[in-house]
Design a protein with these regions (language model features):
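Juxtamembrane helix-capping/reentrant segments at transmembrane boundaries
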Residues: 29-30, 85, 89, 93-106, ...
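Membrane-interface helix starts
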Residues: 34-44
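Generic alpha-helical transmembrane segments of integral inner-membrane proteins
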Residues: 47-54, 109, 169-176
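C-terminal membrane-associated helical module and adjoining short loops/tails
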Residues: 1-32, 140-144, 150-342
Length: 342
């Protein structure tokens, strides 16, 4: 990147990415009219992915059928847009700080959509659904923290393209055979949906720990990592004890980690080192409190569960939006400054 505040290096070890770009993206980029804004491609892809999530959630009560074949088509449209926008920007000379910010910011949301769709496709097994749907956006947020601390954007062997391909297989199986048939498959004592989500959770958790280790090795500060870590433990405990149900735990976990990720992007834009987020620590205390109530009393009233979940989701969802707007304005200012100095 040419803007100092946004300068970083990328280490992408994705297995499928080189082949995906070579055969499915690069040959088609010249067909995109030069007048189309790369940011329009980014926004369009995000909206298509959001529509896929909405359609799948609406179709969740169905055992099988056409929605489970159509949703993968929408998801692959988004995936293509997400990889074509940068190439189109470079080809047409439309690269910008705003485009880079949108790409990373919306990737945080899109990663959350993809794991939530995976959970729905597999029939939403209770505990592992929460674990996977929370730890994946957490991993994305922690990756942005590492990027802000070290200036290196690290992506693992199993990433976006691999996740979408796996989701496509799960959706196709759901469409053909239904959720009961998938749940009936066991690997040892593990139902297949539980095993898949457990593996996803462990891989993402390993990625989080590797991020923290790399930051420490490069002399970065681990203090900003503490609150997100405690919050993750709190949500896991709340889900394991039944203090929070599947939906409420996913909403709370995803909203807090999206907020964390957007904050890390903003720190990098401003050229600042990440700071601890006191609000995330407060959220962890609240969730620990709900879990503690469940363990002491034996039951959490629905009003308490959804009251706590509703407040946390609304507050951190709203704060993520505010921080996103702040970042949007900041990169627009960077683009204007770059244009003025050109």
């Amino acid at each position: 990147m040419s803007t100092p505040a946004l300068t970083y290096s990328v280490r992408d070890r994705s297995i499928l990415l080189p082949y995906y770009k070579r055969f499915l993206v690069e040959p088609l980029i010249p067909l995109i009219p030069a007048r189309i804004s790369p940011n329009a491609i980014t926004h369009g892809g995000h909206l298509v992915n959001l529509a896929a999530l909405a359609l799948l959630v609406a179709s969740a009560p169905m055992d099988k059928g056409w929605p489970f074949f159509f949703v993968p088509v929408l998801v692959h449209v988004w995936l293509w847009c997400d990889h074509a926008d940068g190439g189109h920007a470079r080809r047409t000379g439309q690269c910008s700080a705003l485009g880079e910010f949108l790409d990373h910011g919306l990737d945080l949301l899109n990663a959350t959509y993809v794991i939530c769709m995976t959970v729905v496709a597999l029939g939403t097994p209770p505990f592992w659904s929460v674990t996977a749907a929370v730890v994946v956006p957490a991993a994305a947020a922690i990756t942005y923290w590492e990027q802000a601390e070290t200036g290196v954007f690290q992506l693992g062997l199993l990433n976006q393209i691999e996740s979408v391909c796996s989701l496509s297989v799960a959706l196709t199986a759901r469409g053909l055979f239904g959720v009961a048939a998938i749940a009936a498959i066991h690997v040892g004592s593990w139902p297949l949906p539980d095993l898949v989500l457990a593996v996803v959770s462990v891989v993402a958790l390993f990625g989080i720990l590797r991020c923290a280790m790399r930051v420490k090795q490069k002399g970065g500060r681990l203090a900003p990592f503490v609150a997100p870590l405690l919050f993750g433990i709190a949500v896991t405990l709340a889900a394991a004890t039944g203090a929070l149900g599947t939906l409420s735990a996913i909403l709370v976990g995803a909203s807090v980690y999206v907020f964390v990720g957007v904050c890390q992007l903003n720190f990098r834009i401003r050229g600042e080192r990440p700071q601890p987020q006191a609000g995330v620590l407060v959220a962890a205390v609240v969730v620990f409190g709900v879990a503690g109530y469940r363990m002491r009393i034996g039951v959490v009233p629905a009003a308490l569960e959804w009251g706590a979940a509703g407040v946390l989701t609304s507050v951190f969802g709203g704060l993520a939006l505010v921080r996103g707007i702040e970042g949007h304005r900041a990169v627009e200012e960077l683009d204007r400054a770059k244009a003025a100095s050109a």
